[in-house]
């Protein structure tokens, strides 16, 4: 669904133990890079232990971010992925602004969130987001809505693109 290819540079924001970092590292290969960002040093230590076991530590680079900035290099990433993270952000505006700085022009910001419009999703409302709410929050940034992918049983995949002239 993410259309990753060899050589891509991807950021896994809120990477945790690296579940998605490892899977994406296999897609981008040795010519690509995964910036695995988290605000907890302990999670980054756990993540890198997992990456060493899987022999992808040369592809995955841990980055200790803050609640307002994932600390990505400027204009460095083709895609930024947040899985069940955006709704947890203490400073969503500031974090989104900082993430956009890390995206290359035309780069994609991908949010995976539990569907707030679906009462059958057995997650507390504060841990879900509607598509309309996500679009509203992204509208104040230099992003355009690209598409929504509904292949997961309980979550949306919402893809936004950074303006090519940003």
Could you describe each region identified by the protein language model?
Residues 141, 146-166:
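Core SAM-dependent methyltransferase catalytic element
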Residues 25-29, 93-108:
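A short glycine-rich, Lys/Arg-flanked "PGG" loop and its adjoining helix->strand segment in the class I
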Residues 1-9:
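Conserved alpha-helix/loop element of class I SAM-dependent methyltransferases that forms part
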Residues 68-80:
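A short acidic, Gly/Pro-enriched loop at the edge of an enzyme's catalytic core
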Residues 108-135:
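Conserved class I S-adenosyl-L-methionine
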Residues 8, 32, 107:
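Glycine-centered, small-residue-biased loops immediately flanking beta-strands
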Residues 77-93:
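A short SAM/SAH-binding and catalytic strip from SAM-dependent methyltransferases
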Residues 11-70:
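Class I SAM-dependent methyltransferase SAM/SAH-binding core
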